[in-house]
Amino acid sequence: MEEKPNYVIQVEEELPTLLRKATTEEMVGFDNYKENGHPFPHSISRFHPSHASTTTLNGQETSRSIDTMEAHHHNYNETTPWTHQRKPSISMPTSPNVLMISDPTTSLSSENHKNSGSTGKSVKFLSQPMTKVSSLYIESGNGDDDRRQSHDNHHHHLHRQHQSGHHQNQNQAANKLKDNRYNSFKTWSGKLERQFTRKPASVEPEAPNRNNQNLNTNEAMPVDRYYDALEGPELETLRPQEEIVLPNDKKWPFLLRYPISTFGMCLGVSSQAIMWKTLATAEPTKFLHVPLWINQGLWFISVALILTIATIYLLKIILFFEAVRREYYHPIRINFFFAPFISLLFLALGVPPSIITDLPHFLWYLLMFPFICLELKIYGQWMSGGQRRLSRVANPTNHLSVVGNFVGALLGASMGLREGPIFFYAVGMAHYLVLFVTLYQRLPTNETLPKDLHPVFFLFVAAPSVASMAWAKVTGSFDYGSKVCYFIAIFLYFSLAVRINFFRGIKFSLSWWAYTFPMTGAAIATIRYATVVKSTMTQIMCVVLCAIATLVVFALLVTTIIHAFVLRDLFPNDLAIAISNRPRPKQNSQHRWLDQLRNVSSENIENYLKFTDSDSSQSNDVEACNGKTQESDSS
């Protein structure tokens, strides 16, 4: 049999009129390539009518295209010498569906009808990538075909790499948007973020999160959970067996790490403004010649500090309300909600005389309104006998909820008010006495009382020192009532100050700033006492206590700067707000005795069964039965 030359077999549908016209006119550059006046066989347009074969439904095919291809190939072989053997190249369709033969007249009749009525305008068509191959053809190729095919494959490979990289970047962005680990603490859940994506989000079932199952934002966190999950004098350390609902392997958003105890800085700085104002204006300290510009500088710093901290915490309330709510139910943190309002009272007391001398009366009522709201809530819980009764939640930070009454009474009496300051003084003194006795008793239920000394104990000094000055303003003289409160404060102050190893081995936190204003309050009360009792001893006490208070505040300022800018651990993850509502399930201890009963005799097992009805733990029963068995064996 004579060997047939390489040819192209092509199954095509009937072409539209426009393409048929373009190929018959042999437009330059339109699907053809000529060199030395001879068209290459492989580059002859497969859209040419002479090459297109029509397949009928009966499977009959015209041979005009085959004859034409043979003629072109024969002429080209006579004129062009071949220097190498050509390798056949086969292009297969992308799917077997394209091999289905259909009637081209019925499928393209409407298209031909539309094209027949088109105008004669020249239209430039740009080639587009084809997603499917509509025909099966076998064509022969030479070295140019191989190079062209490898070039196309290279571009196709680069295109796929670009698409895969683009899809990978889109997936990373989508995963970042779908990160819902903090949504349980957000005021808005974050599900609306899907509306800002460029492509519509597919409805996918959310994977169950074990942490979210332990987080119920509709219920208040019971106080027992804080005691069970946290430890330490400030209940900020997570117990080893507990888990948190937020990731602990990375830093949380800044607002989640921003505690309410940050307002303690406002208490320390604003109380210093009052102390330096008293040093500059009081009679016993005239010999120091303290200028008033120190008071002015500290007062403006206090205003800027309060505005900054309050603005940041307001953002936390707006964006992460669940975190604020957990701080409010925290048995320690709830007392720091008095700190911003006490700081405002300190600003009113320490305002420089050059700015204003007489404050309006309505300002006092405005500042004391938050105290009424918080005290009705907290004092009611102390008295109700529930899980937040005072004998259960008593800790030294409760002095912050009491000292505000005395500071308010001091400010009101300084402004010329009478009944209001007496009211708050009476309420504060009643609850201070109850709190003082409860803390001194150290009941077994007071789990938050530190075993060793801690800066939190300085809050014992705050209430009596401020109460002595408030009563002196209410009565108009530093009489016996004021002196009793002052002497209590001084005794507590010295009983704590004689401990030289007070701060050794204690981790620094921002709440330490709240423990500095009691020292400042004791120094100011000493100046008031020296005004009545004039002596060299009282003047020395004024200078020493004021110097200690200033040095402590300066030391805390340096420590805060180091932790903020050098160590960068001023705001660690606030584990106190991330505990779960439900305790961690305890490991099943029913199988602890299996290891002890594997290699024992039947007598030991019978002896163990005698103890199964007792109320003691199983491990102790096993040890007891084993011990008795060993004793009987030895005897």
Curated annotation (Swiss-Prot):
Compositional bias, Polar residues, is annotated for: 102-121, 614-635
GO cellular component terms given for this protein = plasma membrane
* Post-translational modification Phosphoserine, affected residues: S189
CDD domains this protein is in? Answer: TDT_SLAC1_like
Cytoplasmic compartment segments: 1-253, 321-335, 380-396, 441-455, 499-504, 563-635
Q: Where are the transmembrane segments?
A: 254-276, 300-320, 336-356, 359-379, 397-417, 420-440, 456-476, 478-498, 505-525, 542-562
> Where is it expressed, tissue-wise?
Expressed in the whole plant, escpecially in vascular systems.
- Composition skew (Basic residues), residue ranges: 153-165
Please indicate if the UniProt record lists Transport as a keyword.
Answer: yes
Which residue ranges are recorded for the region named Disordered? 102-173, 193-217, 611-635
Topology: which residues are Extracellular?
277-299, 357-358, 418-419, 477, 526-541
Similarity comment text for this entry = Belongs to the SLAC1 S-type anion channel family.
Q: Subunit structure, briefly?
A: Homotrimer. Interacts with KAT1.
> Per its record, how is this protein called by name?
S-type anion channel SLAH3
Whose protein is this, by species?
A: Arabidopsis thaliana
Provide the organism lineage as a comma list: Eukaryota, Viridiplantae, Streptophyta, Embryophyta, Tracheophyta
